[in-house]
Amino acid sequence: MNVKGRVVLSMLVVSTVIVVFWEYINSPEGSFLWIYHSKNPEVGDSSTQKGWWFPSWFNNRTHSYPEEEAVDEGDEQRKENSEELQLSDWFNPQKRPDVVTVTEWKAPVVWEGTYNKAILENYYARQKITVGLTVFAVGRYIEHYLEEFLISANRYFMVGHKVIFYIMVDDVSKMPLIELGPLRSFKVFEIKPEKRWQDISMMRMKIIGEHIVAHIQHEVDFLFCMDVDQVFQDSFGVETLGQSVAQLQAWWYKADPDEFTYERRKESAAYIPFGEGDFYYHAAIFGGTPTQVLNITQECFKGILQDKKNDIEAEWHDESHLNKYFLLNKPTKILSPEYCWDYHIGLPSDIKIVKISWQTKEYNLVRNNI
């Protein structure tokens, strides 16, 4: 073989090796996890994101963007061709006459006993859905809460369906080493720490919105956003899925709206006057489709920025703005307090099964500006 032939052959061999290696690291069977270093990602600009490959202590598979996009297109076509599930197919409000099960705008309030799990599971299994879950753990919240949250979520959150956990931390070196079950994967993002816990709470709206635009909208069908200082106790399943999902706050679900701790100062964008309001919603859990969650986070952050401009801070920070949002944009589904319960209240007869419970609030240990 002449010199020219050997050169061409060498180039072909090298190209083949590169292609094979690239396909391996991007395949579901690859043994790596992509961890993002994203100090301040700009909306729609992935060039600000930086990352490294890490061994998969965390996970037994990785997410493949090209393959998933192809699957997503097929799923969308199948969903269009499938028969839409009607509320009456799976929801029976008469099963729980002891509680409010339907809102004035005809949205279901999901309590244990009101839904047919078998019908829902069968429907969503055919849809081949992917559900995302965002959680923030900054500072000492990582060591105090993150591991237990993730272990319990791995066990109880959307079991049997594909799940992506989006974990936002300010120090990836403190990320607990957890092995996930089948159909589950992690994406870990390093975010900029804030000086005050109040700012961490409010900035999460901005960060979630940025990540939805950058990639989440292409990766999941539904998205939940949750606080880290809580623990899954039982199945948190597909009965919770909807276009726009709000969570009833455990301490206020029986109270009159005028008793709610809404923001009552007119100067705040979160202002809700006495005489108005439906329920008091808990910012520890909210969700919906990526498009709806994006709208929630953008509108809440817009209100936060308006308050900063007017030198005011809503009483309950992002939660106050979330309640204002849901007053103006009614949620299509509401979760009962069973899905986010505080055992300090006790266990009244209407709470049949606790799905998620609050962790003990150790603010003196985890908040750095008290």
Swiss-Prot record:
The chain crosses the membrane at residues 7-25. It comes from Felis catus. The lineage of its organism: Eukaryota, Metazoa, Chordata, Craniata, Vertebrata. It is a single-pass type II membrane protein. Its main location: Golgi. Its cofactor is Mn(2+). GO terms for molecular function: glycosyltransferase activity; metal ion binding; N-acetyllactosaminide 3-alpha-galactosyltransferase activity. GO terms for biological process: carbohydrate metabolic process; lipid glycosylation; protein glycosylation. This is N-acetyllactosaminide alpha-1,3-galactosyltransferase. InterPro entries: Glyco_trans_6, Nucleotide-diphossugar_trans. GO terms for cellular component: Golgi apparatus; Golgi cisterna; Golgi cisterna membrane; vesicle. Belongs to the glycosyltransferase 6 family.
